[in-house]
């Protein structure tokens, strides 16, 4: 029996290694996919985690309480379905991005050890894993929305995720088109299914999109801000290889660019929160975001590209806190 176990151990080890590499490929070993669920379960998309969470929880807060038939259990169930769908789709998008970028990643110090760039995962394995995650995401959305308008919610992010890695190519810079545009859209979009998860029987798809516009715009510019700061870590290698990125717009004036990106965020947050008439949200969301983003912009040092990495962590914590704030708002509305 011992000899049989020994004979099987290399294959078992190889299988475990592949499973781990697939999880790494989808960034499931990191917090990155959680950005996609912030806006929607407020559906992201999170950038994404916060986007989804923000949209779904606050939509639910407008319906609970005052004798309403809408229960906390149902709102939390819809939010969980939204978050799971976003998380799974984000993982699929990461696989596609790394497959397209595998040759570029192999020549960048920070990314050369990624599963596809290093050859630990084959193209066939990666594509099967990607399709599986997309199928799971579609099924979860179908279940959450009772089969209504599922393709309307999926198609925009499918197209965006497909185009995103191509936006990094040098030819796109000639048209002033940068991958951060697509990333911002795909992370912001989950706000729509997040709201629809709650209102799908009460408003049309177009009405849900319109209601989410302030949140969509806020998350769009917030995502470009945090991704520009984070990607700036690779500025030296990216410029050597001619990688197209948003921080090349103003060259050495990246700090000014980041400040400008926060202007629409500062405008859209009040526009979105105004509909809820909640002092708690003004303090816990608008107030905390103002202090955090001001702190981030003062800490960023364009002469030290590594400083962008810490901003990524700060924004994840900011999104996570806002999910907590939205949950508290929901509970206060329900028990008031």
UniProtKB/Swiss-Prot annotation:
Gene Ontology molecular function: any one: transferase activity, transferring alkyl or aryl (other than methyl) groups
Biotechnology comment: Diterpenoid pyrones display various biological activities and subglutinol A shows insecticidal and anti-HIV activities.
Topological type in the membrane: Multi-pass membrane protein
Gene Ontology biological-process annotations: terpenoid biosynthetic process
Keyword tags: Glycoprotein, Membrane, Transferase, Transmembrane, Transmembrane helix
One Gene Ontology cellular component: plasma membrane
Named cofactor requirement(s): Mg(2+)
EC number(s) reported in the record: 2.5.1.-
Glycosylation sites: 66
Highest taxon of source: Eukaryota
Coiled-coil region list: none
CDD domains: PT_UbiA_COQ2 (cd13959)
Transmembrane portions of the chain: 34-54, 80-100, 125-145, 181-201, 205-225, 253-273, 274-294, 311-331
Cell location: Membrane
Pathway: Secondary metabolite biosynthesis; terpenoid biosynthesis
Pfam families, A to Z: UbiA (PF01040)
Principal subcellular localization: membrane
Function: Polyprenyl transferase; part of the gene cluster that mediates the biosynthesis of the diterpenoid pyrones subglutinols A and B. The first step of the pathway is the synthesis of the alpha-pyrone moiety by the polyketide synthase dpasA via condensation of one acetyl-CoA starter unit with 3 malonyl-CoA units and 2 methylations. The alpha-pyrone is then combined with geranylgeranyl pyrophosphate (GGPP) formed by the GGPP synthase dpasD through the action of the prenyltransferase dpasC to yield a linear alpha-pyrone diterpenoid.
Database matches in PANTHER family: 4-HYDROXYBENZOATE POLYPRENYLTRANSFERASE, MITOCHONDRIAL, PRENYLTRANSFERASES
Protein family: Belongs to the UbiA prenyltransferase family.
Protein name: Polyprenyl transferase dpasC
Organism: Apiospora sacchari
């Amino acid at each position: 029996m011992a000899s049989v176990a020994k004979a099987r151990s290399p294959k078992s080890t190889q299988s475990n290694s592949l499973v781990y590499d697939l999880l790494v490929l989808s960034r499931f070993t990191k917090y990155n996919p959680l950005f996609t669920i912030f806006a929607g379960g407020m559906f992201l998309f999170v950038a994404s985690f916060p986007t989804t969470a923000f949209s779904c929880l606050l939509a639910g807060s407008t319906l609970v309480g005052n004798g309403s038939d809408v229960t906390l259990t149902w709102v939390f169930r819809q939010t969980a379905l939204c978050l799971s769908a976003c998380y799974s789709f984000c993982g699929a998008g990461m696989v596609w991005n790394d497959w397209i970028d595998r040759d570029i990643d192999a020549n960048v110090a920070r990314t050369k050890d990624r599963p596809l760039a290093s050859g630990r995962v084959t193209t066939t394995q990666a594509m099967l894993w990607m399709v599986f995650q997309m199928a799971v995401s579609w099924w979860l959305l179908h279940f959450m929305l009772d089969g209504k308008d599922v393709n309307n919610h999926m198609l925009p992010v499918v197209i965006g995720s497909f185009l995103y890695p191509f936006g990094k190519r040098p030819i796109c810079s000639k048209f002033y088109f940068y991958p951060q545009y697509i990333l911002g859209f795909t992370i912001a979009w989950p706000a729509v299914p997040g709201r629809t998860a709650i209102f799908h029987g009460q408003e049309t798809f177009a009405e849900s999109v319109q209601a989410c516009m302030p949140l969509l715009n806020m998350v769009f510019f917030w995502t470009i801000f945090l991704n520009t700061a984070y990607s700036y870590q690779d500025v030296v290698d990216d410029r050597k290889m001619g990688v197209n990125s948003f921080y090349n717009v103003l060259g050495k004036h990246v700090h000014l660019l980041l400040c400008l990106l926060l202007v629409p965020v500062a405008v859209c947050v009040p526009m979105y929160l105004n509909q809820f008439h909640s002092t708690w949200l003004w303090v816990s969301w608008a107030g905390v975001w103002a202090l955090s983003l001001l702190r981030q912009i003062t800490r960023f040092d364009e002469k030290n590209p590594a400083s962008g990495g810490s901003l990524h962590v700060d924004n994840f914590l900011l999104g996570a806190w806002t999910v907590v704030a939205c949950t508290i708002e929901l509970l206060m509305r329900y028990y008031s």
